[in-house]
């Protein structure tokens, strides 16, 4: 179940690895990332970003979406998004979509 290490950039297409699931926990009344023997409870902003990490969207597209939604400075949002995604990737909670080969 080892995830390959990724370096998050605007070109990355992040997604949760197969062993991790973003779910709403009714008991805790909050979103959690479930992975084997681990649970992470991201804050509301992280959940919103993670819901956009579908392996199809690039980090640049995610940043654009959030900057438009919150009418915020793209560079500031970009730095925060990349830092958060890199932290999750370093902890094994995020991977990058691979191109399908025939």
Swiss-Prot record:
This is PqqA binding protein. InterPro entries: PQQD (IPR008792), PqqD_bac (IPR022479), PqqD_sf (IPR041881). Monomer. Interacts with PqqE. NCBIfam families: PQQ_PqqD. Belongs to the PqqD family. Pathway: Cofactor biosynthesis; pyrroloquinoline quinone biosynthesis. Functions as a PqqA binding protein and presents PqqA to PqqE, in the pyrroloquinoline quinone (PQQ) biosynthetic pathway. The keyword Protein biosynthesis does not apply. It comes from the Bacteria. It comes from Rhodopseudomonas palustris (strain HaA2). GO terms for molecular function: quinone binding. Disulfide bonds: none annotated. Keywords: PQQ biosynthesis. One of its GO terms (biological process) is pyrroloquinoline quinone biosynthetic process. HAMAP family: PQQ_syn_PqqD.
């Amino acid at each position: 179940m080892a995830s390959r290490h990724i370096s998050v950039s605007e070109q990355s297409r992040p997604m949760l690895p197969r062993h991790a699931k973003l779910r709403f926990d009714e008991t805790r009344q909050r979103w959690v990332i479930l992975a084997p023997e681990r649970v992470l409870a991201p804050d509301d902003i992280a959940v919103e970003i993670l819901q956009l990490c579908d392996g199809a969207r690039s980090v640049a597209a995610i940043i654009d979406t959030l900057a438009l939604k919150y009418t915020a400075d793209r560079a500031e949002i970009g730095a925060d998004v990349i830092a958060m995604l890199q932290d999750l990737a370093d902890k094994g909670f995020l991977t990058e979509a691979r191109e399908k080969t025939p």
